[in-house]
Amino acid sequence: MKKTLAFLLTLTLLMTIMAGCSHQQMPSPADPVTLNIWHVYGSQTISPLNTLIDEFNRSVGREHGITVNVVSVTSSSAIDEALSASANNEPGAEAMPDLFTAYPRVAEIVGKENLLPWDDYFTENELSAFHAEFLTEGYFGDRLLMLPVAKSAEAFFLNQTLFDRFCADTGITSDDLASFEGVFQTARTYYDWSGGQSFIQINDYYHYAYVGMKAHGVELVRGGTLQLDEDAFRSIWTPLAEAAIYGGICLDEGYAAARWKTAEVIANTGSTADVLYQPSEVIYSDNTTEAIKAMAYPYPTFTDGASGVIYRGGGLFAMKSSDERRNQAAVIFAKWLTEEEHNLTFVTNAGYLPVTDNAFDALFSDLNQIEKENYRSVYAAVETMLDSYTFYALPLYDGASETQLDFEANVKAVLKSARNQYVKRIGNGEDPETVMEALIAASLAELISLSGT
């Protein structure tokens, strides 16, 4: 009897201790937690995520004693650099944030062992609510280190107001923008019609090349090496180079949205999230302004039989803490952010796609619920692509980030040089067709040389 009583007393004591520990491991208003976050959503304008974070802090955050503090809103490349500086304790580096949004490549920068495994805190049922492909990207081995919060696809954006004016004079129509062949022909025609203005800016040549090669049944990257000597690459390089050398493609650095504001270009390919930065008017060189209508169209195709597009977007990472309250606070915020209502509010104000199946279905069941016409056109374009396009995630391989950045820089440098030579040689009286043909071939050879393939 005494042994039984002693056992029961010991068991009761252990349960009390465990309950107390469990309570102590959760944030509360009496024992609050502040989490610092770096993110990429809205670095050039009002941030939809900041607005939602404010809502969290006023509601669920207050109930649990959690404050999410936005420290930095910037580009993904800037976050990569800042994380690297913090991880390496470089002089002047910021303290490592508790939460950050980034691409999978950063796991190596901060160390996978230092990241919070979300699968330890989400039940199987909770994880099953996520769109399977989006969730898969976040796994490193068997650990879920990157939680999807928003994804984007690529689309074709158009200043419809100025384009319609151009169409009235030339007979070009929006149907000509369905393929890259048509886009590049339109770019040359626009250059002539406008007196020397570029038509389009391509925000990501690596994506252009990746999807273009896929359309021809060939991989852009094999064994970590670009396959630029393939006939398939030559077939997608030639029309691109011709339009760029002619002057129809803007090759300068910077964002397309900035050039929309001054009508330096009237179109671009880029992330669906570009809609967040599109201006509602243009300012001309004489300081007059004009209201414009911006519209989105599906990503142009390369061949009749193969339509493809990149989907992208990083996810939410959390630094693992020895203070379990901080881990729990990160999880509470992450679960709140990915709930259908909050996730839809966030993504539809930023041009992104929701990350759970239910939210996905709710969005595309009725696009009329989206008030702004330019945003509605983005999701209409995505809906079209969901029906008939293959969606590709970029491959991860050693040096992928550097390869992509180098390719972007090399394409622009090679085409800028060819463009300058074209203007000079034509000005000296050489035959335009002969010069163009030579420069297309020379630019490809130079790109292959620079890429080391």
Roles of regions detected by a PLM:
Residues D119-F130, T173-D175, H216-I236, E242, ...:
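Short, solvent-exposed loop/beta-turn-alpha elements that line the ligand-binding surface or hinge
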